[in-house]
Amino acid sequence: MRVAVAQFATSSNTQENLATCIRMIKNAIECEPLIIVLPEYCNTQAEHKNHQQAWDEALDLNGEFLEQIAIQAKLHKCYIMLNVTLRRDLIRDEQNPLIKSNVSITTCIFSPAGELIHQADKQTLQACESEFFICSEKTTDSVSTPLGKLGILAGTETLSNKNTRDLAIHGAQLICNAQSSQSHAQNSLYASAWACDNNVFIATANKISHCEFVKSNKAMNSNGSSQIVSLNGSVLATLANDKEGIIFADIDIEKAGLLKHQRPDGTNFIDQYRPELYQQLALLPKSAHTAALKSKLPETANVVLFATYKSNEQAIEDVCYYIENNLSDIIQLPELFFISDKSITNNAQQLIEIETLCSALIKQISTVLRPFQYVCTSLVINGAHQAVLISENGIFATQQQLHFCKRYQWTALGNNLKIIVLPLEQGSINIAMLTADDASMPELIDVAALNKVNVILMPFDIQTSSEVNFSLLSRAAEHKICIVASSREKSFLDEQSSNDISKVKPGNMKKIKPQKSTGLVVDIVNANISISLDKLKVKQQHGKITKALVHPSETFKSF
């Protein structure tokens, strides 16, 4: 099916805005879409001087503005989604412009029959919006149509994966997102991450600022960047942030949705998802613990990603040699770092031999570690796959794998995320460890952030390039949390190329070069600002040894 997105400016003149909407709908119809997505605040602008202005510029649900949009939907036989401000009372009794009216920011969907089939009030209001607008009871229901199931978001609701996830859990396959946003992260990072995490397409229609408004308030000029994002996070179509226009893309909505979401090893999402695990409440007392944590948080910690190319005993010796000749606080190794072919773990006899080797390597590595120095990896202990932290005294902490995956279907699963206080030479930090597919569940990072984790250590085996290109970056940005993740190097087809693989002629297949992907270190350098991709300090794992600094003290500012 074809999806079209319109990007344009609005003014404070409602009739002018209606004319603009109709003009852009007619422009979009030229590409023959089945659904057209329009931006946020189609009838007005986001800023208001007082409550009287907010009321005057808001629409009646049965008024001319929406009636004309309904006519366009019926005339062109397509779905039209737009976001407007709606009056929720018949009249405004108050004469005082400083007294608030019942006005909502509402997204409406009109069917090809010209009927209003869905309306949803914006739930995540910014401070300036809360002053003028209300929101009704939240709904996370997807909208069932002959095309597929649609999910509706507006504005800053896309800054959290939770909103997209809630819609996806309720069956959404295409997220229609109306924006009037300045956030670069929403367009450059979050949309791609949320699409990958939830196996949904995301069509975002953003605003450009009206010329008169730009002159009066240049700082509020919207970033625009309307776009359509595919299931793998690749951008199918985008529009420059200062241009009025239409973009469109053809999507296969039958492939979308969490019910059809699979990991590369064939593990189904529904076999991994564990809602009971994400209900874990904050484990630590807030006020007293926070004060104590702040007083002893180290400013920095030295970390290294170490990915040996060797196997078995030689791999262990390789790690020990590095430890003896370096002073890193935390040496992060990949998942089961000494095994190149993880499939051998599915052989019962070999699994016993692997566990024996794991016991030996704990002793061997601990003998060369200095005080306040640690190695993080994953091992097989007591028949279970688990992340481990090794100190000079042996095992310091363990974290059993929490989510099922076919790669390690033999392992028992843990039932809670452990929050570990890790002593370093300059103080202590809170850490959590994630291995296998655990980090693919954003809810688990929510639990870590709720419990004031400064650094997440990840011994993992990368399965898709989107994990490091989008997902892990978005986790760090959303929660302002440092991530240290190490994997053996893998090669994947470029996301855009793989998205269009059916269009590639057989003779040109060799021209599509696989892209190498590994782990990374994501550092938070200034938690006082709104974090976007360009505000994260990211160091990609390169070669055998990748050294980096992380700043746990900056993560505290977000608690």
Language model: regions and residue ranges:
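Active-site mouth loops of central-metabolism enzymes
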Residues: 9-16, 152-158, 307-314, 435-436
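CN hydrolase (nitrilase-like) catalytic-core segments centered on the catalytic cysteine
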Residues: 58-82, 159-247, 354-374, 440-538
